[in-house]
Amino acid sequence: TQAGLVVDTCILKEADDKMLNTYTVIAVNPEAPFVDADGNSVADVAVNTAGADALIQWFLTQETLDLAANYGFQEYGEYLFYVKDGAPVYTGEIAPATEETKVIRLSTTTSVKDSGLLGYLLPIFESTYGYTVEVQSAGTGKAISAAKFGNADLILVHAKSQEEAFVEEGFARTVDGFEAERISFLYNYFVLCGPSADPAGVKEAASVLDAFAAIAEGEYPFISRGDGSGTHTKELSLWPEALGI
């Protein structure tokens, strides 16, 4: 129950491409214009580029992609992540940890962390290559801000517009074996949840855009993340343009 609204069922799932939720990994540029929380420039930020490269390269091996794609099915009977069509596959060497590179700081989203995917994958990476991955999670906006503050070596997030801004502002770099700064490789779907009574008739909506329009036109309550996260960014893109949200 949220704000007097009983949310007890998923009423729209995987309806169309607008519900796609794509995950992207980006390496942090050690020469980026780092700032503090007040926007002041920060110098002498140490970024573990070698460790970030190793983790990103490992994420994109066929073996790891297969592990991610199959994660969740045995426990939940459903796949929680899918490999994105056209995702690059890394086939080169992956450098093991050294004393200087063994700690990797990963800033990611709550959806990735809470899914349990990293808890499943990272111990395999750590035991194989000798690294220790320190994971901090928040909404995408805050996860990206952590990198801008110099507190991450790489980010794993899911909001294209914010990712592109991160790249354009000079915070990203390419990784050996890849052509682009943004490496999108996994996806799943957002779902629309609400009361089983479904007063807005969302279940009958032809698309998620129609569903949001019905909610807006009927002035039904809607619970928003409202936090600049990837989920919030997606939500804002789905409301009718006429509302000016």
Model regions and ranges:
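Exported/periplasmic ABC-transporter solute-binding proteins
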Residues: 1-132, 141, 145, 151, ...
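Acidic, polar ligand-binding/catalytic clefts
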Residues: 154-187
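Short Pro/Gly-enriched coil loops immediately N-terminal to beta-strands
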Residues: 16-21, 175-197, 208
